Amino acid sequence: MVNKKVNKKCLVTIPAYGRNELTHAVLPDVLAESDLVDLLIVDNGGHYEAVADEWVERPGRNLGWAGASNLGFRTAFHRGYEYALTLNNDTRLSPGFFAGLLDTRLPDDRGLVAPVYDDWWALQASTYKGAVSDYEPLDYYRRVPMLDGTALMISADAWEKVGGFDERTFGRFSWGSDIDLSMRVAAAGFGLYATERSFLHHAGMVSAGESVGKRRYFYRAHRDCERALRRLYGRATVRALRKALPERIPLEAPQPSVQVDHSTGASG
């Protein structure tokens, strides 16, 4: 690892392929917490137009979602960030989103951390139905066996142990590679957590759905996902994962700072 000094804790990577307006829409949500995170756009399509002096990498070919995410992970950890996060561009984030993911009250063994959201994985699904900008953070987190890659943060320690997404096994769209990464991170002894202090809205299947058609995209992505997971882990394990429930745990209250009376040296 190259230990170049950085001032932020996390590098956020957005894999982008067309639909610049989606990426532009989520930029303010990310940049609102620029005291905590830096932002990298991986331009898979070669046509991204920067609007906020954002850092853009143009690999010259379409790396796919998994490949672009892995490029972001490698870049982050070679530069010395503690965490790296991949974020879909068809998303919007609640206020304080990254503060929630980086909350030091989460267990020390965290290897993967993600938000709760309005998408379909029950392990991360929230009952909240309002505007993402009005979400009120809850002091709970969930211990889970797998996490969705829509917005997924990995620690440097976990990445050094297991690496990133498998770019070969899960087909063109990489569905299921997030489950596989979750399994490998958990097997290496790290915790997987979804925090209710962070909420994400996901439009879902936008860029890929438009490029190949939503029905065809869903069929191919789901087929490749199921085949790969069953081959790697077996039907029984995959079935158990689908039925798994989260363990909901309260976050400890922040500890009050100690006030020191400098005239006497006493604390109170």
Identify the meaning behind each predicted range.
Residues P28-V37:
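Short, acidic, metal-binding catalytic loop of nucleotide-sugar glycosyltransferases
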Residues Y193-G213:
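Active-site donor/metal-binding and catalytic loop motifs
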Residues T91-S126:
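Conserved donor NDP-sugar-binding/catalytic core segment of glycosyltransferases
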Residues N20, I41-V51:
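A conserved acidic beta->alpha catalytic loop
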Residues Y81-R92:
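Short beta-strand-to-loop acidic/aromatic patch adjacent to the donor-nucleotide binding site
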Residues L152-I154, A158-V162, T169-S198:
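A short, conserved alpha-helix in the catalytic core of glycosyltransferases
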Residues P59-A76:
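Glycine-rich, basic loop-to-helix element that forms the pyrophosphate-binding segment
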Residues W120, Y135-I154:
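A recurrent flexible, glycine/aromatic-enriched loop bordering the glycosyltransferase active site
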